[in-house]
Regions:
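Long, contiguous amphipathic alpha-helices that act as assembly "spine/axial" helices in icosahedral shell
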Residues: 47-111, 238-248
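Short charge-dense sequence patches
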Residues: 27-45, 71-77, 223-239
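Sequence/fold signature of self-assembling virion shell proteins
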Residues: 160-278
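Alpha-helix capping and helix-coil boundary motifs
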Residues: 71-79, 114-125, 215
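Intrinsically disordered, low-complexity boundary segments flanking structured domains
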Residues: 4-10, 44-53, 125-131, 165-168, ...
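Assembly/oligomerization interface modules of large self-assembling protein complexes
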Residues: 1-61
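Extended, solvent-exposed, turn-rich assembly/linker loops in the middle of proteins
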Residues: 105-183
Length: 278
């Protein structure tokens, strides 16, 4: 997930800590400059550091169970491995669904008349926003309705990729990654753009020693421990049970650094003529 989204800053939250980041900025205007005479004391520029508090991460707990009857009927490959994969994808989609909902609250509004123009203006506006804050942008990721994407392509061929339930295309019209989503996540005629520098991933490590003190040992994989799982056999029910623990939140540091482009197709000449005649 981190690799696909290009997330730059995974931030581990230790138990007992609060989610707080700090922003530094010039308090007022720069002092000094060419007005300082030779030998005069150079005035200090006043700076300020302000804390920014985020909503706390809630721990989510899930479990699934596979019976010996299911294994006998379908085999372990289907009853266990396939359901394990589907279970983990569903967990990821829960996190992504919350993130997509949050993206739609972006306050950098953009108006466009075509889908292509919407993509271009959405990216241009976030680049302009971050440049005005003297912030660097290395990559911009986009989110679009999948039907709008294929409607734009028409009979043109382009290679899309699918991983962990995500459909996306890389290096498309200036976007490092363009995610193609169904209408339940992003409406038609809407495009969202956000720099990867504006995406933070806060997470709780399920393998944290504080949890182990409860006798809860979760297995994690990868560089960032996002989802912890534990598999145990329940002889009293003759089932194999998988337990999952996760606590993560995808967050955008600047709401006005998320461009939401709304596309309103321009009226055709014939349509305007008909209305005029009416």
């Amino acid at each position: 997930l981190r690799t696909i989204m290009g997330i730059m800053r995974p931030i581990r939250k230790a138990p007992g800590t609060k989610l707080v980041s700090y922003e530094a900025a010039v308090d007022g205007t720069l002092a000094g400059g060419t007005s300082v005479a030779e030998g005069d004391e150079i005035p200090l520029t006043k700076m300020k550091v302000e804390p920014k508090t985020y909503g706390d991460i809630e721990i989510a707990k899930y479990a699934k169970s596979v019976s010996v009857e299911a294994v006998a009927k379908y085999g372990a490959d289907v009853a266990v491995e396939k359901t394990d994969e589907a279970f983990l994808v569903a967990l990821q989609n829960k996190v992504l669904g919350d993130f997509y909902t949050f993206l739609n609250t972006g306050s950098l509004a953009v108006a466009a008349t075509t889908w292509q123009q919407g993509l271009a203006l959405a990216k241009g506006n976030v680049l302009d926003k971050f440049a005005s804050m003297d912030r660097d942008v290395t990559e911009v990721v986009g989110f679009a309705n999948i039907l709008d994407f294929y409607g734009y392509l028409g009979d043109k061929e382009i290679t899309t990729q699918t991983a962990f339930g995500l459909t996306y295309v890389q290096n498309f019209m200036g976007y490092s990654t363009l995610f193609l989503l169904p209408a339940k996540y992003i409406a038609r005629n809407k495009v969202i753009a956000v720099p990867v520098e504006n995406i933070d991933l806060y997470y709780i490590d399920p393998a944290d020693s504080d949890f182990a003190k409860l006798g809860l040992n979760y297995t994690v994989q990868g560089e960032t421990n996002l989802i912890g799982v534990h598999v145990d056999g329940d002889y009293s029910r003759a089932t194999g049970d998988m337990y999952a623990l996760m606590g993560m939140k995808l967050w955008a540091e600047y709401l006005d650094g998320i461009a939401v482009a709304t596309i309103t197709p321009a009226e055709t000449k014939s349509t305007k003529t008909v209305k005029a005649e009416q």
